[in-house]
Amino acid sequence: MENLPIELLRLIYAYCDPPSVRNLREANRTLADLGYDYLLPPNLSVVTWRQDVDRLLSIAQHERLRGSVTSVCIYLGELSYQDAMKNSWFQHFVLPPEERSEILASAWDSYDQIETRRKTVSPLHSRADDLREACSSLPNLTSVEVCFNRYPSENKVLREVFQEVACRKLDRAQTYGNLDAIIAAIDGLRLSSFQIDRLPLELFRLPDHRKHWFAHTHSFESLSTLHLTLDPSGLKGQGSAMRAVNGLGRLLLLAKNVRHLKLAFHPYSRGNSKFVIMFRELLNGFTYTQLTDLILEGLSCEEHDLTQFLERHGGTLTRLRLGGRGLAKSHEVSLGGIHLYSGTFKSLFKGLRTKLPRLERLHLEGIFECQHHELASHESYNFYPLTDENWQPVPCPRWVRSSRNTINCLTFEQYVLHGGPYPGASFAQQHFGG
């Protein structure tokens, strides 16, 4: 086998799973040498209950292995024990008692092991220097994701119960420190993608953390993908919110070359509420000259302000997603829609027909509602998803049924892209739940 061309051997390795790679490397010296490049997956995980920072640092210091890593996902989510116990019992209620007890006992044994290991591992923020050294020594690192909303356990019960928002806990002070460590670790790297699925918005009003972030965001200029899901539940009062939004705006302005932008708000204190945003204050008229894909979720805004923001990107924007799943429970309708406290969706969508000439796809998900219920122009829609954020089709959710008046956005997309009568007028006659 060692007599085969190098190109063919590399092709064979490319189709091998990790155990096969290890076995193949033991065959002879040639295969052992070639197999170095396939020992590691390109995507590495850092989990807070494992010694993954040490592992990452060792890989970064290895001359042959460090070039294999292109992306790192850092998992910071923690399970709320009491809430998870209660929810997991209800999730397995239909099982026979003995089977249910066995499954749940195994799950909580796994949880106990995780928490025992967590106590032996130093918090991420205390390893800031090691994390920075590791990231700066990975020459091909282009993507960093910070994940609070997935639980990387091998136990299925723990993974599933973690999908319930109530089963996640967040130590905000520790989270600030961990995020500070991460943003310092990536400072100066030429990243193409940076994503956080729960960023406490109040971090941008706290002077020390605010200064730290603005001093360590040089990597943002090279980003082509920036996905930020903000948690505004830690804000107290309008002044606090204004300062935090001002800080968020400064951060967004640094990512001036993004092509894919997601800006979502998940209010953990009130899962069905929307966060008020004025784009003219957030971005001060700034235009992303290369923006092709935009996701906006969980906002309350003015129709005119939103239209102006979208119009500025009419020359490049090809795919637009408004709304999303939000913080809905598994049995609930999507909550991350859009609220207009001024204007109507009819006027908004009519304007988009002419202001976004390059638009190819439009997707709506969640509860869309105008402010003034007493007016004849009032609109309220409950959209279920047709595609995921990568525009791949998804099956019709189980929570869709006619009694909930859920509809899909297909007729609205057709209206914006191709014209015709406004579909909102025939809302009551649309097919529900299909």
Model-derived regions, located:
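N-terminal Skp1-binding subsegment of the F-box domain
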Residues: 1-30, 126, 132, 136, ...
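Conserved beta-strand positions
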Residues: 46, 74, 146, 196, ...
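Ordered, helix-dominated protein-protein interaction surfaces in large eukaryotic regulatory proteins
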Residues: 11-14, 26, 33, 74, ...
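Acidic, serine/threonine- and glycine-rich low-complexity intrinsically disordered segments
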Residues: 212-225, 229-231, 237-242, 246-261
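Hydrophobic regular-secondary-structure patch
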Residues: 2-86, 143, 173-176, 185, ...
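Glycine-rich, aromatic-flanked loop segments that form ligand/cofactor-binding clefts
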Residues: 71, 90, 148
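Leucine-rich repeat
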Residues: 36-40, 48-59, 64-69, 79-131, 137-143, 151-179, 200-212, ...
